[in-house]
Design a protein with these regions (language model features):
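Conserved RecA-like ASCE ATPase "motif II neighborhood" in helicase/translocase motors
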Residues: 120-153, 162-166, 276-280
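Pre-Walker A (Motif I) flank of P-loop NTPase domains
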Residues: 46-57, 82-83, 132, 292-293
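Conserved pre-motif I regulatory segment
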Residues: 2-58
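Conserved coupling segment at the C-terminus of the helicase ATP-binding
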Residues: 36-37, 43, 54-60, 151-153, ...
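Conserved Walker A/P-loop ATP-binding site and its immediately adjacent core
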Residues: 66-105, 110-114, 140
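Conserved SAM-binding loop
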Residues: 31, 86-87, 134
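ATP-binding Walker
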Residues: 63
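A short beta-strand-to-loop transition that corresponds to the Sensor-1 phosphate-sensing loop
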Residues: 90, 135-140, 158, 297-301
Length: 343
């Protein structure tokens, strides 16, 4: 008896809006006006600009952007047989999006939060075979050995707040309370280029003074270039220490930026020294670079090029928020007020 080889079905769904009406297990009646408007704008833009790789969608808080991202991902998966993943800043948001996708919208999204060695084989197979979309944290993509190394469509939720998550792959932080030896070695190199007040803070903390968290300063780039050779030698020495390298990740983090210090900034506080590039070099990161489409969902886009700087893109096409979105929202906002600011 011959084996029956399953054939991938060819699904013809005109657009993500039509897909929503086809979701039989959803518990919400219909799309909000601004959600439908954004999906139409997205499709119009894609149809007119087929070679556009980077698109930003302005979807303010409470406008229902999660469903928009899920529908685009599911539509690309079904109609183009693409591997699609929606990336969130935190694990809690991943869990929330997956729960909403399944219980409210009838979309089978897979939860890829946590370390990749804990992903189930069934989930990995379903994702790689384009049978389900994935939802994961930014760190699941931006690491040296990501599971998502061959994704067709990347959708970034809360892209305006993603800078630290994206740049973490190319950031080296040395904390005084974790590795005082390396911290002191670097401080002695940069100390001549710091202010007298900052040097006093350093010595006060060293003499068991109270931790001063009220300042963050930066070594001027010309001075950083002057001490680059000594700085490289000090961090090379720390990264050769097997114990420190394994515990704090010096080796692989340092290898990402060692030859590019001229493009980095060095920030310091009383307890931490951070070296990272101003612009994330994502063009050299293949899991990000070779995606067919990258969609950035942001509460605010602006015109200053900040989104391009965060993601290392030369140009990101923008689709502004539909008019009247604030008259029909689904989210609640939580505001924190610093007591010091109102005293």
């Amino acid at each position: 008896m011959a084996f029956k080889i399953p054939q991938k079905s060819s699904v013809s769904i005109e657009d993500p809006e039509s897909l929503f009406r086809d979701l039989r297990e959803r518990t919400v009646e219909g799309l909000l006006a601004q959600q439908a408007d954004m999906l139409r704008k997205y499709m119009n833009h894609v149809n007119k600009n087929k070679n556009t790789l980077d698109i930003a969608l302005e979807l303010p808080t409470g406008s229902g952007k999660t469903l928009v991202g899920l529908l685009i991902a599911e539509w690309c998966r079904r109609t183009k047989q693409e591997r699609c993943v929606l990336l969130c800043p935190t694990k809690q948001l991943v869990h929330q999006v997956v729960e909403q996708a399944k219980e409210k919208y009838g979309i089978n999204a897979l939860d890829f939060s946590g370390p990749k060695n804990r992903y189930s084989e069934a989930d990995k197979t379903a994702f790689n075979n384009c049978e389900s979309i994935g939802v994961a944290t930014y760190s699941a993509l931006f690491n040296t050995k990501p599971f998502f190394s061959d994704v067709h469509t990347l959708i970034f939720d809360d892209a305006h707040a993603a800078e630290n998550y994206v740049s973490s792959l190319w950031s080296l932080e040395v904390r005084r309370d974790q590795d005082e030896t390396t911290f002191d070695a670097i401080w002695q190199i940069i100390a001549p280029y710091t202010t007298e007040n900052d040097q006093l803070r350093y010595y006060d903390q060293g003499n068991e003074g109270s931790l001063d968290t009220s300042f963050v300063n930066k070594i001027l780039t010309p001075y950083l270039l002057k001490c680059r050779t000594a700085l490289t030698a000090a961090i090379d020495n720390a990264s050769r220490d097997d114990e420190s390298s394994e515990e704090y990740g010096y080796r692989w983090r340092w290898s990402m930026i060692k030859d590019h210090l001229h493009a980095c900034h060095l920030y310091y506080t009383s307890n931490s020294i951070l070296i990272r590039p101003l612009i994330a070099p994502t063009k050299s990161f293949l899991p990000f670079q070779k995606a067919r489409q990258r969609i950035y969902m942001s509460a605010t886009l602006g015109e200053g090029g900040d989104l391009e700087r965060i993601f290392g893109r030369k140009k990101i096409e923008r689709i502004p928020a539909p008019g009247g979105w604030d008259k029909q929202g689904i989210g609640r906002r939580l505001k924190f007020v610093d007591r010091k600011s109102v005293v």
